[in-house]
Amino acid sequence: MKLIDFDVDNDRPFFLIAGPCVIESEYLALHTAEVLKTITDELKIPFIYKSSFDKANRSSGASFRGLGLAEGLRILAKVKETFAVPILTDVHEYTPLDEVASVVDVLQTPAFLCRQTDFITRVCAQGKPVNIKKGQFLAPWDMKHVVAKAKATGNEQIMLCERGASFGYNNLVADMRSLAVMKTFSAPVVFDATHSVQLPGGNGASSGGQREFVPVLARAAIAVGVAGIFMETHPEPEKALSDGANSIPLAQMRHLLQQLRALDTLVKTNELMKELS
């Protein structure tokens, strides 16, 4: 599949989707984009910058949601112009899709909305690449129906994203079998390594997380053989206004990406490993 200006597939070198969970300020957006662009250029990893102008799914009504549509899109446009990087952002049921699609390069649908047929159809009908997150409540084989709905719009630029499955209360588990199953649906598969360690509502009025397991799961997904890795990162996760508990410190991204690139190269170029994946 052609994604912006590079080819993506489950057997091609992986690409990265990364950035802060939510746009907190113009400075934070530009700073994280600059650091990530420098690292990915050095490691030759195709990079898509992500951040949200509005986080609709929040544990508490008092939680920070973002800077809003107009300011958020202005900042994303500035990131795109300043660093020449493609942009991904979330859209929701009442998002003015035309306005967002005029700025960003990839649209992302939230996991909780993956079964909403009209929503998925409207987003995919924009003709932009779409990253569809698998619901925490959904079996991986059920995503083939979501792919069919999406591609029925005529849009072939559809990706599937695994972000963990509900495992009792306030917990998620990442089942690597899900990646293998979804790879059979003729769509690039992305693994969300940071939301997969989230503890939804685990802190009462906010979600917790176990960021120490992000590198473990990211390496496991790369070993399975995926098209892309999604990770949220922040210079100071403890001060992040959304999902800090499961965000990777920005200072740790270089080392982790070096590991992932080395493993990805092994899995996708070694003939024996290619047979296993």
From Swiss-Prot:
HAMAP family given in the database record: KDO8P_synth (MF_00056)
Protein name: 2-dehydro-3-deoxyphosphooctonate aldolase
EC numbers: 2.5.1.55
Gene3D superfamilies the record matches: Aldolase class I (3.20.20.70)
Pathway membership, UniProt: Carbohydrate biosynthesis; 3-deoxy-D-manno-octulosonate biosynthesis; 3-deoxy-D-manno-octulosonate from D-ribulose 5-phosphate: step 2/3; Bacterial outer membrane biogenesis; lipopolysaccharide biosynthesis
Family classification: Belongs to the KdsA family.
The keyword Cytoplasm is assigned to this record: yes
Catalysis: reaction(s): D-arabinose 5-phosphate + phosphoenolpyruvate + H2O = 3-deoxy-alpha-D-manno-2-octulosonate-8-phosphate + phosphate
Gene Ontology terms, MF aspect: 3-deoxy-8-phosphooctulonate synthase activity
EC class name: transferase
Keyword Cytoplasm: yes
One annotated GO biological process: keto-3-deoxy-D-manno-octulosonic acid biosynthetic process
Alphabetical keyword list: Cytoplasm, Lipopolysaccharide biosynthesis, Transferase
InterPro entries according to UniProt: Aldolase_TIM, DAHP1/KDSA, KDO8P_synthase
NCBIfam families listed in its UniProt record: KDO8P_synth, PRK05198.1
PANTHER family to which the protein is assigned, alphabetical: PHOSPHO-2-DEHYDRO-3-DEOXYHEPTONATE ALDOLASE
Chief localization: cytoplasm
Source organism superkingdom: Bacteria
Locations listed in the record: Cytoplasm
One GO term describing the cellular component: cytoplasm
